[in-house]
């Protein structure tokens, strides 16, 4: 009898997946440079510097004793509150754990077959290609314009009979720019594929594209509680989908994927409009401060981060210099086709923003 080797148990597609590269953690930087952890400023993962809503924290404390009980299988309680927040009926909403990534996993699970294609404009959030590849799909990359805008004609030109999903990000990560409504309409109206718009950062922006889900049955929008709501550690996301897709998604969705703690914290966070508005205003004011004061070219942003071009310096060297000073930022060389001179900087508190500006000023002469 012949036995498979352990690697032979794994699907071939898995070996084609490049490992996802997250931002550096406080623990990593503290260990690498001998810095006291409380003094480190983490501006590399686009987290909310104000933390979660006090109401969400209170909900976690009150819910924890009941953590031995399963939550509702479909997160109905959260979806009802999201219905009021988004203006969409519950029948258009799905909740997902872990975060929006879980939504992407679920959609690829029900849509992508071996040999299917997904379109990914680059540079953008790296995760889109991972679940597609894991399901046997092939990512087709379309380069963005030099200003990181999309060319709808290029996107549509990449569509083939095997195209199943087109992934778009607005505001885009790592560039922070919005997708114009006219461009989205053109893409959606001229493809058979599902168009997925990632709006993880949309609360920080001047407008959103979610309303178009009412008009098109091949358009879906994903959102998260990790950014403006400050619940990144709970891994909670949701999708606004056409009703036909909600039905099929629910067939294969992981039961109880949203934990009881995440569910209750999400409901509480949605009720705290004061914390929501403070978080939005902090990001909007801070990104303008960073754009005006960082001594390198800074792209306009509609998110809670800015993209810095440190040319002629290299992003890795400048980022390492900042990290030695206890400031974590994100060099963008791990983003496909982003080059080696871009750094993404999360908007922090005013004090943190001042420190990062000073660190960039010093790095400009040190690197």
UniProtKB/Swiss-Prot annotation:
Key words of the record: Amino-acid biosynthesis, Aminotransferase, Histidine biosynthesis, Pyridoxal phosphate, Transferase
GO biological process, one term: L-histidine biosynthetic process
EC number(s) per entry: 2.6.1.9
Pathway entry: Amino-acid biosynthesis; L-histidine biosynthesis; L-histidine from 5-phospho-alpha-D-ribose 1-diphosphate: step 7/9
Cofactor(s) needed by this chain: pyridoxal 5'-phosphate
GO terms assigned for molecular function: histidinol-phosphate transaminase activity; pyridoxal phosphate binding
Reactions the enzyme catalyzes: L-histidinol phosphate + 2-oxoglutarate = 3-(imidazol-4-yl)-2-oxopropyl phosphate + L-glutamate
Record-stated family: Belongs to the class-II pyridoxal-phosphate-dependent aminotransferase family. Histidinol-phosphate aminotransferase subfamily.
Protein name according to UniProt: Histidinol-phosphate aminotransferase
């Amino acid at each position: 009898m012949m036995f498979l080797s352990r690697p032979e148990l794994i699907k071939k597609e898995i070996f084609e997946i490049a490992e996802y590269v997250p931002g550096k953690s406080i623990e990593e930087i503290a260990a690498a440079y001998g810095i006291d952890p409380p003094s480190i400023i983490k501006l590399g993962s686009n987290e909310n510097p104000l933390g979660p809503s006090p109401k969400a924290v209170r909900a976690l404390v009150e819910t924890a004793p009941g953590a031995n009980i399963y939550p509702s299988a479909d997160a109905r309680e959260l979806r009802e509150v999201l219905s009021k927040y988004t203006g969409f009926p519950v029948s258009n909403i799905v909740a997902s754990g872990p975060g929006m990534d879980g939504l992407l996993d679920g959609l690829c699970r029900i849509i992508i077959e071996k040999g299917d294609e997904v379109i990914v404009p680059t540079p953008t959030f790296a995760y889109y290609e991972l679940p597609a590849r894991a399901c046997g799909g092939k990512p087709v990359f379309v380069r963005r314009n030099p200003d990181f805008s999309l060319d709808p004609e290029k996107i549509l030109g990449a569509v083939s009979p095997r195209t199943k999903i087109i992934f778009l990000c607005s505001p885009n990560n790592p560039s922070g720019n919005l997708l114009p409504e006219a461009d989205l309409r053109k893409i959606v109206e001229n493809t058979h594929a599902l168009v997925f718009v990632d709006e993880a950062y949309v609360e920080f922006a001047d407008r959103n594209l979610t309303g178009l889900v009412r008009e098109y049955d091949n358009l879906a929008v994903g959102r998260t509680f990790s950014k403006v709501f400050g619940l990144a550690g709970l891994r909670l996301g949701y999708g606004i989908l056409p009703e036909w897709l909600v039905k099929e998604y629910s067939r294969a969705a992981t039961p109880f994927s949203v934990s009881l703690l995440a569910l209750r914290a999400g409901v509480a966070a949605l009720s705290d409009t004061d914390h929501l508005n403070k978080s939005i205003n902090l990001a909007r004011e801070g990104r303008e401060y960073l754009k005006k004061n960082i001594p390198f070219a800074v792209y306009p942003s509609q998110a809670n981060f800015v993209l810095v071009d440190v040319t002629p310096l290299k992003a890795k060297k400048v980022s390492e210099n900042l990290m030695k000073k206890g400031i974590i930022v994100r060099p963008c060389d791990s983003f496909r086709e982003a080059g080696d001179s871009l750094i993404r900087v999360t908007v922090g508190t005013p004090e943190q923003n001042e420190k990062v500006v000073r660190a960039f000023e010093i790095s400009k002469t040190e690197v």
